[in-house]
Amino acid sequence: MSTIEERVKKIVVEQLGVKEEEVTNSASFVDDLGADSLDTVELVMALEEEFECEIPDEEAEKITSVQQAIDYVKVHVKS
């Protein structure tokens, strides 16, 4: 079983079409990885599907980096 961090990074690579080595914990989806608003919505939807959770819109807006996505999942998803 992959760790939450590995699973989040895999989703980011798949959704944004970036190289795995570009996906660092501090990487911003928009500034560093070139995501647009549609990409970020699709990214949140992929996270919801992977971790079988619902991320409210007001929370999704706060998830702007890889680390924030990892932290959100760790806090809100029962492993």
Curated annotation (Swiss-Prot):
Keyword Flavoprotein found: no
The keyword Phosphoprotein is annotated on this UniProt entry: yes
Pfam families hit by this protein: PP-binding (PF00550)
PROSITE patterns from the UniProt entry: CARRIER, PHOSPHOPANTETHEINE
Chief location: cytoplasm
Subcellular location: Cytoplasm
Domain Carrier: 2-77
Post-translational events: 4'-phosphopantetheine is transferred from CoA to a specific serine of apo-ACP by AcpS. This modification is essential for activity because fatty acids are bound in thioester linkage to the sulfhydryl of the prosthetic group.
Biological process according to GO: lipid A biosynthetic process
Pathway: Lipid metabolism; fatty acid biosynthesis
Gene Ontology annotations for the cellular component aspect, listed alphabetically: cytosol; membrane
Keyword line: Cytoplasm, Fatty acid biosynthesis, Fatty acid metabolism, Lipid biosynthesis, Lipid metabolism, Phosphopantetheine, Phosphoprotein
Residue list for modification O-(pantetheine 4'-phosphoryl)serine: 37
GO MF annotations, alphabetized: acyl binding; acyl carrier activity
PANTHER family: ACYL CARRIER PROTEIN, CARRIER DOMAIN-CONTAINING PROTEIN
Matches recorded under HAMAP family: Acyl_carrier (MF_01217)
Sequence similarity: Belongs to the acyl carrier protein (ACP) family.
Physiological role: Carrier of the growing fatty acid chain in fatty acid biosynthesis.
NCBIfam families in alphabetical order: acyl_carrier, PRK00982.1-2, PRK00982.1-3, PRK00982.1-4, PRK00982.1-5
Protein name: Acyl carrier protein
Species the sequence originates in: Xanthomonas albilineans
Gene that encodes the chain: acpP
